[in-house]
């Protein structure tokens, strides 16, 4: 396994995370980089693996089923996260394939995931996705519904480790990241999945523990 060259896209993103962490008085190791590989071919993924990247994210269950089993057979130390919306009827397939789910956002999905986990005998850590900007077109639970959804998930035996958000596009993301951090604190959660290619520095400075980066690593889709 090689190490990412500082001038490579991966090396550049790692340096950005390290710089933002230093400014915030955090250790670089406090933040995990998720390489978002949706729509990208196996060769592009394998190139990042060869450079040392070990955590990847996908948006769709079906696409992941088509390309990831072979990659993971060759690289069993790679971790795969689902960051896109999850249909309840795909819950069992998601539990079987993924190591973490970032898009738990409604009671029906809690029920489906709990059933799938019991059937497969596998517990998958989950983030609750919060619709932090109250946008009708986006997934995520409403801020006001978070305590009830979290309680339901915990009662169902789901390991909720943190919160995830996608702030509204085109406006300053910092207030939304700060709100997600506060919601996590208020609900006893320590992990925050927030920040992408264009705003990862702000997210890291406001407490992100996972950043989801695609275009800065793979180029525009």
Region spans (language model):
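Expand to "…catalyze enediolate/carbanion chemistry for C-C bond making/breaking, isomerization
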Residues: 204-205, 217-220
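Conserved alpha/beta-domain cores
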Residues: 1-190, 196-198, 204-206
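Divalent-metal-activated hydrolytic enzyme cores
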Residues: 209-210
